[in-house]
Protein backbone atom coordinates (compact mmCIF):
# COMPACT_ATOMS: atom_id res chain seq x y z
CA UNK A 1 0.00 0.00 0.00
CA UNK A 2 1.27 3.49 -0.76
CA UNK A 3 2.52 5.59 2.12
CA UNK A 4 0.10 8.23 3.35
CA UNK A 5 0.76 11.29 1.29
CA UNK A 6 0.40 13.51 4.03
CA UNK A 7 -2.70 14.34 5.93
CA UNK A 8 -2.34 18.07 5.62
CA UNK A 9 -3.95 17.64 2.20
CA UNK A 10 -5.84 14.41 2.52
CA UNK A 11 -7.88 15.30 5.59
CA UNK A 12 -9.05 18.56 4.12
CA UNK A 13 -12.39 17.31 2.92
CA UNK A 14 -14.47 15.30 5.28
CA UNK A 15 -16.61 18.18 6.45
CA UNK A 16 -16.86 21.68 5.06
CA UNK A 17 -19.06 22.60 8.01
CA UNK A 18 -16.29 21.58 10.41
CA UNK A 19 -13.97 24.16 8.86
CA UNK A 20 -16.19 27.03 9.89
CA UNK A 21 -16.46 28.69 13.29
CA UNK A 22 -20.18 29.16 12.62
CA UNK A 23 -22.68 26.28 12.42
CA UNK A 24 -24.15 25.62 9.02
CA UNK A 25 -27.37 27.59 8.56
CA UNK A 26 -28.64 25.90 5.42
CA UNK A 27 -27.92 22.89 3.20
CA UNK A 28 -24.79 23.22 1.10
CA UNK A 29 -25.60 24.17 -2.49
CA UNK A 30 -23.71 22.54 -5.34
CA UNK A 31 -24.93 24.41 -8.40
CA UNK A 32 -22.29 26.80 -9.76
CA UNK A 33 -19.12 25.64 -11.49
CA UNK A 34 -17.01 26.82 -8.54
CA UNK A 35 -19.24 25.00 -6.06
CA UNK A 36 -19.05 21.82 -8.11
CA UNK A 37 -15.27 22.11 -8.34
CA UNK A 38 -14.81 22.48 -4.58
CA UNK A 39 -17.28 19.69 -3.88
CA UNK A 40 -15.34 17.45 -6.27
CA UNK A 41 -12.13 18.40 -4.47
CA UNK A 42 -13.67 17.11 -1.27
CA UNK A 43 -14.72 13.82 -2.83
CA UNK A 44 -11.33 13.26 -4.45
CA UNK A 45 -9.36 14.04 -1.32
CA UNK A 46 -11.59 11.89 0.89
CA UNK A 47 -10.74 8.94 -1.34
CA UNK A 48 -7.11 9.29 -0.24
CA UNK A 49 -8.02 8.25 3.31
CA UNK A 50 -10.64 5.67 2.40
CA UNK A 51 -8.41 2.89 3.75
CA UNK A 52 -9.07 4.15 7.29
CA UNK A 53 -12.77 3.16 7.06
CA UNK A 54 -13.51 5.73 9.74
CA UNK A 55 -16.11 5.07 12.41
CA UNK A 56 -18.57 7.89 13.24
CA UNK A 57 -16.57 8.62 16.41
CA UNK A 58 -13.30 8.78 14.46
CA UNK A 59 -14.88 11.05 11.88
CA UNK A 60 -15.77 13.52 14.65
CA UNK A 61 -12.12 13.57 15.74
CA UNK A 62 -10.93 14.11 12.18
CA UNK A 63 -13.42 16.96 11.77
CA UNK A 64 -12.17 18.51 15.01
CA UNK A 65 -8.57 18.38 13.81
CA UNK A 66 -9.58 19.75 10.43
CA UNK A 67 -11.48 22.66 11.97
CA UNK A 68 -8.61 23.48 14.35
CA UNK A 69 -6.12 23.43 11.49
CA UNK A 70 -8.21 25.64 9.23
CA UNK A 71 -8.98 28.06 12.05
CA UNK A 72 -5.31 28.20 13.18
CA UNK A 73 -6.17 26.87 16.64
CA UNK A 74 -3.44 25.23 18.70
CA UNK A 75 -3.49 21.45 18.09
CA UNK A 76 -4.23 19.29 21.13
CA UNK A 77 -1.74 16.68 19.84
CA UNK A 78 1.54 16.65 17.94
CA UNK A 79 0.47 15.74 14.38
CA UNK A 80 4.04 14.90 13.36
CA UNK A 81 4.35 12.39 16.20
CA UNK A 82 1.13 10.68 15.06
CA UNK A 83 2.30 9.87 11.54
CA UNK A 84 3.66 6.43 12.38
CA UNK A 85 0.53 5.48 14.31
CA UNK A 86 -1.72 6.62 11.48
CA UNK A 87 0.32 4.59 9.02
CA UNK A 88 0.03 1.55 11.29
CA UNK A 89 -3.76 1.94 11.56
CA UNK A 90 -4.18 2.41 7.81
CA UNK A 91 -2.13 -0.68 6.99
CA UNK A 92 -3.94 -2.83 9.56
CA UNK A 93 -7.35 -1.81 8.29
CA UNK A 94 -6.32 -2.25 4.68
CA UNK A 95 -5.20 -5.81 5.46
CA UNK A 96 -8.37 -6.56 7.41
CA UNK A 97 -10.50 -5.38 4.49
CA UNK A 98 -8.44 -7.45 2.05
CA UNK A 99 -8.74 -10.59 4.19
CA UNK A 100 -12.49 -10.13 4.52
CA UNK A 101 -12.92 -9.59 0.77
CA UNK A 102 -10.76 -12.62 -0.01
CA UNK A 103 -12.83 -14.92 2.21
CA UNK A 104 -16.09 -13.59 0.80
CA UNK A 105 -14.78 -14.04 -2.73
CA UNK A 106 -13.82 -17.67 -2.18
CA UNK A 107 -17.30 -18.39 -0.84
CA UNK A 108 -18.95 -16.55 -3.74
CA UNK A 109 -16.88 -18.39 -6.35
CA UNK A 110 -17.59 -21.76 -4.75
CA UNK A 111 -21.32 -21.11 -4.81
CA UNK A 112 -21.24 -19.78 -8.39
CA UNK A 113 -19.28 -22.81 -9.63
CA UNK A 114 -22.03 -25.15 -8.42
CA UNK A 115 -24.79 -23.47 -10.39
CA UNK A 116 -26.30 -25.23 -13.38
CA UNK A 117 -24.96 -24.29 -16.80
CA UNK A 118 -21.62 -22.82 -15.76
CA UNK A 119 -18.06 -23.82 -16.58
CA UNK A 120 -15.14 -23.36 -14.21
CA UNK A 121 -11.77 -23.03 -15.89
CA UNK A 122 -8.55 -24.49 -14.51
CA UNK A 123 -7.48 -20.99 -13.53
CA UNK A 124 -10.64 -20.54 -11.45
CA UNK A 125 -12.89 -18.36 -13.62
CA UNK A 126 -16.58 -19.25 -13.53
CA UNK A 127 -18.20 -18.65 -16.93
CA UNK A 128 -21.87 -18.72 -17.85
CA UNK A 129 -22.68 -18.30 -21.54
CA UNK A 130 -26.05 -16.57 -21.55
CA UNK A 131 -26.25 -16.23 -25.34
CA UNK A 132 -24.26 -18.24 -27.86
CA UNK A 133 -22.68 -16.19 -30.60
CA UNK A 134 -22.44 -17.21 -34.22
CA UNK A 135 -19.22 -15.47 -35.23
CA UNK A 136 -15.53 -16.11 -34.70
CA UNK A 137 -13.73 -16.46 -31.40
CA UNK A 138 -11.07 -13.84 -30.66
CA UNK A 139 -7.43 -14.59 -29.96
CA UNK A 140 -5.55 -12.97 -27.09
CA UNK A 141 -3.79 -10.69 -29.58
CA UNK A 142 -7.04 -9.39 -31.10
CA UNK A 143 -8.79 -6.12 -30.41
CA UNK A 144 -12.38 -6.63 -29.34
CA UNK A 145 -15.44 -4.41 -29.26
CA UNK A 146 -17.65 -5.15 -26.27
CA UNK A 147 -20.42 -3.94 -24.05
CA UNK A 148 -19.92 -4.83 -20.42
CA UNK A 149 -20.95 -4.18 -16.86
CA UNK A 150 -18.68 -4.88 -13.89
CA UNK A 151 -19.98 -5.48 -10.36
CA UNK A 152 -18.67 -6.31 -6.93
CA UNK A 153 -20.11 -9.44 -5.34
CA UNK A 154 -22.55 -7.27 -3.36
CA UNK A 155 -24.06 -6.16 -6.67
CA UNK A 156 -22.55 -2.67 -6.73
CA UNK A 157 -21.75 -1.57 -10.29
CA UNK A 158 -18.26 -0.06 -10.57
CA UNK A 159 -18.03 0.28 -14.36
CA UNK A 160 -20.48 -0.05 -17.24
CA UNK A 161 -20.16 0.71 -20.93
CA UNK A 162 -23.90 0.03 -21.08
CA UNK A 163 -24.64 2.94 -18.75
CA UNK A 164 -22.30 5.16 -20.76
CA UNK A 165 -24.08 4.12 -23.95
CA UNK A 166 -20.79 3.51 -25.75
CA UNK A 167 -19.15 0.13 -26.45
CA UNK A 168 -15.51 -0.26 -25.47
CA UNK A 169 -12.69 -1.37 -27.76
CA UNK A 170 -9.38 -2.66 -26.43
CA UNK A 171 -6.66 -5.28 -27.04
CA UNK A 172 -7.64 -8.49 -25.30
CA UNK A 173 -4.12 -8.98 -23.93
CA UNK A 174 -4.17 -5.50 -22.40
CA UNK A 175 -6.85 -6.12 -19.77
CA UNK A 176 -7.13 -8.20 -16.60
CA UNK A 177 -6.26 -11.90 -17.06
CA UNK A 178 -9.85 -12.96 -16.36
CA UNK A 179 -10.98 -11.02 -19.41
CA UNK A 180 -8.12 -12.20 -21.60
CA UNK A 181 -9.01 -15.82 -20.89
CA UNK A 182 -12.77 -15.54 -20.52
CA UNK A 183 -13.59 -13.50 -23.62
CA UNK A 184 -11.61 -15.96 -25.76
CA UNK A 185 -14.28 -18.56 -24.94
CA UNK A 186 -16.96 -16.37 -26.55
CA UNK A 187 -18.05 -16.00 -30.16
CA UNK A 188 -18.95 -12.69 -31.77
CA UNK A 189 -22.60 -11.95 -31.02
CA UNK A 190 -22.47 -13.91 -27.78
CA UNK A 191 -23.02 -12.86 -24.20
CA UNK A 192 -21.47 -14.31 -21.06
CA UNK A 193 -21.04 -13.70 -17.37
CA UNK A 194 -17.51 -13.96 -15.98
CA UNK A 195 -16.92 -14.42 -12.26
CA UNK A 196 -13.30 -13.42 -11.78
CA UNK A 197 -11.12 -14.51 -8.84
CA UNK A 198 -9.17 -11.65 -7.30
CA UNK A 199 -5.83 -13.03 -8.51
CA UNK A 200 -7.08 -12.80 -12.10
CA UNK A 201 -8.56 -9.34 -11.59
CA UNK A 202 -6.97 -6.51 -9.56
CA UNK A 203 -5.41 -8.61 -6.81
CA UNK A 204 -4.19 -7.35 -3.42
CA UNK A 205 -4.05 -3.70 -4.45
CA UNK A 206 -7.50 -3.41 -5.98
CA UNK A 207 -8.23 -0.40 -8.15
CA UNK A 208 -9.05 2.48 -5.80
CA UNK A 209 -11.46 3.99 -5.22
CA UNK A 210 -13.95 1.66 -6.91
CA UNK A 211 -12.48 -1.84 -6.49
CA UNK A 212 -11.31 -2.97 -3.04
CA UNK A 213 -8.24 -5.16 -2.46
CA UNK A 214 -8.71 -8.89 -3.11
CA UNK A 215 -12.12 -8.33 -4.69
CA UNK A 216 -13.83 -11.07 -6.67
CA UNK A 217 -15.59 -9.42 -9.62
CA UNK A 218 -18.59 -10.23 -11.80
CA UNK A 219 -18.73 -9.07 -15.43
CA UNK A 220 -21.58 -9.32 -17.90
CA UNK A 221 -19.99 -9.17 -21.35
CA UNK A 222 -21.37 -8.93 -24.88
CA UNK A 223 -18.81 -9.58 -27.62
CA UNK A 224 -19.91 -7.26 -30.41
CA UNK A 225 -17.02 -7.64 -32.84
CA UNK A 226 -13.37 -8.47 -33.41
CA UNK A 227 -11.81 -5.24 -34.63
CA UNK A 228 -9.40 -5.55 -37.53
CA UNK A 229 -6.28 -3.36 -37.42
CA UNK A 230 -6.44 -0.27 -39.60
CA UNK A 231 -4.46 -0.65 -42.81
Which residues make up each language-model segment?
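Bacterial Sec-type N-terminal signal peptides, specifically the leucine/valine-rich hydrophobic h-region
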Residues: 13-16
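Cross-family detector of peptidyl-prolyl cis-trans isomerase
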Residues: 3-6, 19-231
Amino acid sequence: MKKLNWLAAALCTLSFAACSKEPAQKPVEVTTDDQKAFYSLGVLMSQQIESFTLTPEELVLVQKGLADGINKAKPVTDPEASKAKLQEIAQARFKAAADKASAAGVEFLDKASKETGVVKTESGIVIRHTKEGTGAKPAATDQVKVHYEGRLIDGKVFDSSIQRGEPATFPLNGVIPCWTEGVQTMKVGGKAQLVCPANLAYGPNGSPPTIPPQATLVFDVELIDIVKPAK
